[in-house]
Swiss-Prot record:
Notes on the domains: Contains a C-terminal catalytic domain, and an N-terminal region which modulates catalytic activity.
Recorded catalytic activity of this chain's protein: [protein]-L-glutamate 5-O-methyl ester + H2O = L-glutamyl-[protein] + methanol + H(+); L-glutaminyl-[protein] + H2O = L-glutamyl-[protein] + NH4(+)
Localisation: Cytoplasm
GO BP term (any one): chemotaxis
Keyword Zinc-finger in record: no
Disulphide linkage map: none
Alphabetic keyword roster: Chemotaxis, Cytoplasm, Hydrolase, Phosphoprotein
Stated name of the protein: Protein-glutamate methylesterase/protein-glutamine glutaminase 1
Underlying gene: cheB1
Residue intervals passing through the bilayer: none
CDD domains, per the entry: CheB_Rec (cd16432), REC_CheB-like (cd17541)
Residues with the 4-aspartylphosphate modification: D58
UniProt xrefs under PROSITE patterns: CHEB, RESPONSE_REGULATORY
């Protein structure tokens, strides 16, 4: 028997958005739109008849806002939710609230040129729905079917930075930690960073997230943590007690000047279909930090970071992968484990200890 299609409920007050998203998703062989609603009140009437595998949800709607609806869903029947948000500061902040409330993915939409943008972003939407369908949301049963990845060709970290020549630079007194994550990473990073004391190694983090969202995300983590957390700026020095988060839409690399590590924030093509890319970050850490670094790959769909973690291991870094039981999506860690890139496989609640102790 063929695998069951992923059923999707769309909730958005824009008729244009609903029309385009229904067409895109229903044109995808493994996805079926079981309903579309103009607001959460209509959505609840549809949920009374049939429950989907995934909900695609706008956050700014009449009668009931998306956050209130999301919290209601998560309290009654936890379900993977993809947030469809505007590319505005308010949209970013509201979407981060949604991620904290249990949403697993964000896709963005502009304020103008909406129809063409959504059509151009069809692959991103489909990938987000597939990632959500394969996520483990709280006590949601895990799907047995593997996610269907986009077979289109993708660039590797070679497009940004050549691999290390075989000899990592000599160890310094400063140890650094590089972290890569995607789907489910916002909640996972919050759990890890808020568990750290003020005195800890400097960190560089790639979280797959749209442009304009990472600054708000960093501000939120900073307000919750004892350490300092902020969006990275070009040439920032990596310091103990500081976590630098790669800006959405940019790659972040580590470089070294004397005994000190800095970051470079650069433009460049998508790597593994992402910008920022975990592989780009990890490769730079392997090249410039080697034995003086720890690499940690956490929850997320796909394979971004798997090869980079192996390069870090080969350069002498300590390497860690999050275990399947604590992942929202066991994709990136799974691919790293397949490559024998992880020295240790540990649950989320132990990752802060891996940061503190090599």
């Amino acid at each position: 028997m063929p695998n069951k299609k992923i059923s999707v409920l769309l909730v958005d007050d824009s008729a244009v958005v609903r029309q385009v998203l229904v067409a895109i998703l229903n044109d995808t062989p493994d996805i079926h739109v079981m309903g579309a609603a103009s607001d959460p009140i209509f959505a609840m009437s549809k949920l009374a008849q049939e429950w989907p595998d995934v909900i695609v949800l706008d956050v700014e709607m009449p009668r009931m806002d998306g956050i209130t609806f999301l919290k209601k869903i998560m309290s009654e029947r936890p379900t993977p939710v993809v947030i469809c948000s505007s590319l505005t500061q308010k949209g970013a902040e509201t979407s981060l609230q949604a991620l904290s409330a249990g949403a697993v993915e964000i896709i963005t939409k502009p304020t103008t040129g909406l129809k063409n943008f959504l059509i151009d972003s069809a692959a991103e939407l489909v990938a987000a729905v597939r990632a959500a369908a394969n996520s483990n949301v709280r006590n949601l049963g895990k799907r047995t079917a593997a996610p269907v990845l986009n077979p289109a060709s993708k660039l590797t970290a070679d497009a940004i930075l050549p691999a290390a020549s075989g000899h990592a630079m000599a160890q310094t007194t400063e140890r650094i930690v590089a972290i890569g994550t995607s789907t489910g990473g916002t909640q996972a990073l919050e759990a890890v960073l808020t568990a750290l004391p003020r005195v800890c190694p400097g960190m560089v983090i790639v979280q797959h997230m749209p442009e304009k969202f990472t600054a708000s995300f960093a501000e939120r983590l900073n307000s919750l943590s004892q350490i300092e957390v902020r969006e990275a700026r070009n040439n920032d020095r990596i310091l103990p007690g500081l976590a630098l988060i790669a800006p959405g839409g940019k790659h972040m690399m580590v470089t070294r000047s004397g005994a000190y590590y800095h970051v470079q924030v650069i433009d460049g093509p998508l790597v593994n279909r992402h910008r920022p890319s975990v592989d780009v970050l990890f490769r730079s850490v392997a090249k410039f930090a080697g034995k003086n670094a720890t690499g940690i790959i956490m929850t997320g769909m796909g394979d971004d970071g798997a090869r980079g973690l192996k390069e870090m291991l080969d350069a002498g870094s300590a390497t860690v992968a999050q275990d399947e039981a604590s992942c929202v999506v066991f994709g990136m860690p799974k691919e790293a484990i397949k490559l024998n890139a992880a020295q240790r496989i540990i649950p989320l609640q132990e990752i802060h200890q891996a940061i503190l102790h090599r």
